Amino acid sequence: ATSFGVPLKSEKVMDVRRAVESPAEGTVSGYVVKTGSNEYKAKTVLFATGSHHRKLGAPGEEKLENKGVSYCALCDGAFFKGKVMSVVGGGDSAAKEALLLSEHASKVHVFVRGDELKAEPVNSDRVKAKVEEGKIEVHYNTEVAEIMGENSVEKVKLKSGEEMEMGAIFIAIGQIPLSDLAANLGVELNDRKEIKINRKSETNVPGLYSAGDVTDTQFKQAITGSAEAVTASFWAFDYVGRNKVVFE
């Protein structure tokens, strides 16, 4: 982008608002992006604000992050090949993480806080098959109290007091999308507060687009987010060409 003269700004966005609340017939409102130190006019806005992985909050989690504590089996599972691994979570994401890790781990322990693994039927059946093979073990009504190790994950301590040797632990208890800026403009969210987009990466609000982990798309990978952003860019260019955007 910089080779074409596009300026890059490293500023925290505080607010995005419509420039004109009631634009004249035949025109559409542009947007004003407010940062901590400036305001910028924009004919379209792409929200690529991402999401935060929901943290477990156990002692040792922060210290050992990227040292055996991970939030993405697809990203990091292969680094711990042959080791005993664990997954914390009780939903479909946890089931899918465990299944993926079972291809790399000597064994996968799944710690479920409740009394049921609430996975999609197909994934539930696949987990049961792996349990029968001895590749996965599911521990119900079980919570991790502490993640232990000096320079890497070595053990997990359960709230029951039991300690288990572990080479890696994957936290799969959900994500927190950073969608508030978009929501304030009337952008539609799903029940997980992810931004709803269509195949053009458009939101329900004209001129507003979204891409990456903040969206309701299934796969949360850098390459898929990049593809969504490219798609949004094409359609934003088309939008600007078809509409007269005004700021007053």
Task: Specify the residue positions occupied by each region the protein language model found.
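FAD-site-proximal beta/loop scaffold in flavoenzymes
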Residues: 52, 57, 62-79, 173-219, ...
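Generic hydrophobic/aromatic pocket-lining and core-packing "Φ" positions
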Residues: 98-99
